[in-house]
From Swiss-Prot:
GO terms for molecular function: magnesium ion binding; mannosyl-3-phosphoglycerate phosphatase activity; phosphatase activity. It comes from the Bacteria. SUPFAM superfamilies: HAD-like. Its cofactor is Mg(2+). It is an enzyme of class 3 (hydrolase). One of its GO terms (cellular component) is cytosol. It holds the Pfam family Hydrolase_3. Belongs to the HAD-like hydrolase superfamily. MPGP family. One of its GO terms (biological process) is mannosylglycerate biosynthetic process. This is Mannosyl-3-phosphoglycerate phosphatase. Mg(2+) binds at D13, D15, D214. Its EC number is 3.1.3.70.
Length: 271
């Protein structure tokens, strides 16, 4: 089991994991977040959300100043104390949001793929799609290194679309509710490994890592963790890990923040 006194990093997905997928409630996890904060354990948020959205969430969760992984790993917000880093305050993996927009525009124009991106609609429509208020919806549109969209074509056409993207050095990632196009070099796992190495240098010791996630797109992140909590989710595909050893992986009975708390209780119950 883990100890709160270990050199430790916690990486967590948001929607469906730390946050309830429908209500965005996080309060069941509050006692653990407080304990981790008081013990100086970094809790690193990982999501398809934009950095602007996640910085606001960090403040709500009392995690401000810590690193975060946004846009499925295409953006890393650096620790507030790393201002000497040449890319401070954010690292961007691969090509920019505007460059990806241009690629998608050309593909849609040339091959008539059917999809609707967040850039195609206004804040009101985003609010209807997500259940967020208008101010929060505006933050979801502030992508820096990815494009979020709703796919409106057939599975066969999707396979063709993915092949075109791959040829252009891009990938198509399915999140909790939307699809995301980002550079093929980006990923939650690559971003997590970068941060683990940064903390190893800072602490002069390799951190132990615990990751929490609920969907198939969290598997790459959980695969690079020392320990993992698979929070019970709504996705029928489930979460398939390369190493599903029960000494390393706990699968919760509860969903969302209740499952998050359950997983933390499990790994730290003997600390």
């Amino acid at each position: 089991m883990l100890s709160i006194h270990d050199p430790l990093l916690i990486f967590t997905d948001l929607d469906g994991t730390l946050l309830n997928s429908h209500t965005f409630e996080w309060q069941p996890a509050a006692p653990w977040l407080t304990r981790l904060h008081e013990s100086g354990v970094p809790v690193i948020l990982c999501s398809s959300k934009t950095a602007a959205e996640m910085l606001q969430l960090q403040t709500t969760l009392n995690l401000q100043g810590l690193p975060l992984i946004a846009e499925n790993g295409a953006v890393i917000q650096l620790d507030v104390h790393w201002e000497d880093h040449p890319n401070y305050p954010r690292l961007i993996a691969g090509i920019s949001h505007n460059e990806i927009r241009l690629v998608l525009h050309k593909l849609r124009e040339k091959e008539q793929f059917k999809f609707t991106t967040f850039d195609d609609v206004d804040d009101q429509v985003i609010s209807e799609w997500t259940g967020l208020n208008r101010a929060q919806s505006a933050l979801t549109r502030l992508h820096e290194a990815s494009v979020s969209l709703i796919w409106r074509d057939s599975d066969e056409r999707m396979a063709q679309f993915v092949a075109r993207l791959n040829d252009l050095g891009l990938q198509f990632v399915h999140g909790a509710r939307f699809w995301h196009v980002l550079d093929a070099s980006a990923g939650k796992d690559q971003a997590a490994n970068w941060l683990i190495e940064a903390y190893r240098r800072q602490w002069r010791a390799r951190p132990l890592t615990l990751g929490l996630g609920d969907g198939p797109n969290d598997a790459p992140l959980l695969d690079v963790m020392d320990y993992a909590v698979v929070v019970k989710g709504l996705n029928r595909e489930g979460v398939h890990l390369r190493n599903d050893d029960p000494q390393r992986v706990y699968r919760s009975q509860n969903e969302g923040p209740d499952g998050w708390r359950e997983g933390m209780d499990y790994f730290f119950s003997r600390s």
